[in-house]
């Protein structure tokens, strides 16, 4: 079952969040953090997929601080709009929304909540691990993680990257690995966005492998 709820951050900002509920008792809570394209069809499908695996899933509309109801396509126009919206919102404010979503997911599931993020959401997932209190974190192709590599994760972290990703140099990932050898890092024969079936860079094999590892990771730590 899915629905949209309104949540409130600790600065009183209200934002929408897509909720996907599992059948039966939740295994744990899970926050799905969007790419720069909003809580679109793909992100909702990701949330639904995790709900099928038993998680109580919540995807916050982090662009609500700049514009409501953002759903962008995977083309140049959508990318430009997403980047423009991103630049209007301070990352600390975005993390307030993620934090509020974490508390909601944990409260509603009655279990610890993790975070999984994609693209920009992958970077936010990393910052959730270093600044917030999730149970565990997974990040997919977070291109800005290297900028925050000096921050130490408080919880177990797994990161997924594509070897054909033109946006993320392998040297950047190496810096993160050197600083935090305890972080699980996996490489795939894919490009940026290899998990998204709506992108030309979608790689089914890589997507399935990453999902299997992600589920095993969350099942271990949440």
Task: Annotate each language-model stretch with its function.
Residues 1-222:
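N-terminal cap/leader regions of alpha/beta-hydrolase-fold enzymes
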